[in-house]
Amino acid sequence: MLRYINTVGVIYMIEIQNLSVSYQGQLALDKANVTIKGPTITGIIGPNGAGKSTLIKGLLGIVDHQGQALLDGQPLDKELKRIAYVEQKINIDYNFPIKVKECVSLGLYPKIKLFQRLKTSDWDKVNQALKIVGLEDFAERQISQLSGGQFQRVLIARCLVQEADYIFLDEPFVGIDSVSEEIIMKTLRQLRKDGKTILIVHHDLSKVVAYFDQVLLLNKKVVAFGSTESTFTKENMQQTYGSQLFMNGGA
C-alpha cells in the first residue's frame, strides 16, 4: 500500500539561502533567498535562461553552487532520499530497453538494500501507482512504445512509489497531451492534499492561476514570491519578463 500522508502536525519547509550558480564564469542564478512552506504546489516561473532549472539543480547538488538549502532545518544534501525529482524529458533516453513497470520500480531503490530483490508488496506498489496515472495496462510495454504524455505519467508513477515528502518537477507538461496533463495535475493535487510539497518549473503562463498555490518569479534573481493571487500580477510579470512578456503575447 502506498504511503502518502505526512506526519500530522509536522511543518515541511524548504529554505533557500543565498544560492548562486555560475556556468563557465557566467552567473546563472544570483543569491536566491526564499522559504517555501508546505504542503503546497509552487510554480517556478520566468523567461528562458532565467535560472529556473538551475535553481532545482542547485538545490539537489547536481551543479556546483554557493549558498545553501535546508530541508526542515537540515542540510538538503543530507535529505535527498526525501525528494523525488523528475528532470526535463530532453535529458532522458527513451530508447533504453526497460519496461514500464521496471521504470516505475526504480523509485523504490533509494529505500532498499543493494542487490536486494523486490518483494511482492513492492510490485503491488508499482501496480497501484500505474493505476493512479491510468497506465495499469501498460506495465509490460517498453518505454520506447509510449507517447510523450504516457511516459511523463510513468515518471510521476515513479515518484509515487518513492513516497517522498518533496517532489521537484522540471517542465513536466512540455510536449504532452491534454489528457496526460490533466491526470498529472489531478495526481499532484492529491499529493498536496496528503501533505506533500511540490515545486514545478513551468513556462505556460496561461495555466499559472489554475495550477499553483504559490509562484516564485525568477530572472537570475528572485523577483517575487508569494501566493499566486498576490504575486502573479502584471507589475511583477513585467519586472520578470520585460519585453519578452509582450513578445510572447502577454500574461
Curated annotation (Swiss-Prot):
Q: What Pfam families is this protein classified in?
A: ABC_tran
Membrane topology, from the record? Peripheral membrane protein
SUPFAM superfamilies in the record, alphabetically? P-loop containing nucleoside triphosphate hydrolases (SSF52540)
Q: What is its EC number?
A: 7.2.2.5
| Protein keywords | ATP-binding, Cell membrane, Manganese, Membrane, Nucleotide-binding, Translocase, Transport
Provide the family line: Belongs to the ABC transporter superfamily.
> What does the UniProt record say this protein does?
Part of the high-affinity ABC transporter complex ScaABC involved in manganese import. Probably responsible for energy coupling to the transport system. Essential for growth under Mn(2+)-limiting conditions.
Protein name as catalogued: Manganese import ATP-binding protein ScaC
